[in-house]
């Protein structure tokens, strides 16, 4: 488990990463609608603490199409497409849990699968058991890191290695599609992230 095997990084690396996140969050503050401002501000306010989380190798494009599962056993076989992987604070790609336990409709937004609550409870119980000794405050911080990861991925245009430099989303097809995820996970009371410990 990556939490127990953090990657060694220099103080300078952490500082550069934090400056990058701060700059990108500032861009989102200027570009995204007001309904997202409380979430952006919560990430800014927690950024110093987020940077104290274990630094781990994160798959930055962890989607259902990049996860290979054995059809008969439903066991994980492999994870592909590591081109955008980077060392970041733990939790920045946990928004993937939402995307794997629900589906996005262009008209209705995010809809959770019937077993969503059981899957999430199972994940957090297993994680807490494996890691051991996490306080409610640490779990809350991980959940805010998840929100930061969502904003950095869905608040911007594509971050793929072969694409132009990402910019905040706008009122185009990509922007509207990503806004559905931001609304679903940050605003909609039925599907928004739980950020409590």
Describe each region flagged by the PLM:
Residues 57-59, 79-80, 149-156:
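Short beta-strand segments
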Residues 1-75, 188-196:
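An alpha-helical support segment within catalytic cores of ATP-dependent transferases
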């Amino acid at each position: 488990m990556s939490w127990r095997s953090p990657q060694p990084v220099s103080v300078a690396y952490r500082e550069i990463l934090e400056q990058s996140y701060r700059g990108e969050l500032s861009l989102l503050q200027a570009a995204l609608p007001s309904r997202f401002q409380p979430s952006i501000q919560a990430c800014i306010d927690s950024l110093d603490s987020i940077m104290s989380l274990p630094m781990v190798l994160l798959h930055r494009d962890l989607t259902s199409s990049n996860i290979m599962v054995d059809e008969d056993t439903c066991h994980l076989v492999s994870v592909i497409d590591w081109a955008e992987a980077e060392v970041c604070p733990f939790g920045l790609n946990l928004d993937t849990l939402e995307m794997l336990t629900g589906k996005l409709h262009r008209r209705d937004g995010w809809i959770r699968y019937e077993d969503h609550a059981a899957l999430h409870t199972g994940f957090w119980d297993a994680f807490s058991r494996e890691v051991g000794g996490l306080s409610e405050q640490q779990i809350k911080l991980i959940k805010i890191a998840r929100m930061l990861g969502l904003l950095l991925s869905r608040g911007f245009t594509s971050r793929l290695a072969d694409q132009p430099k990402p910019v905040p989303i706008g009122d185009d097809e990509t922007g509207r599609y990503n806004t559905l995820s931001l609304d679903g996970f940050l605003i909609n009371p039925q599907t928004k992230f739980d950020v409590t410990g």
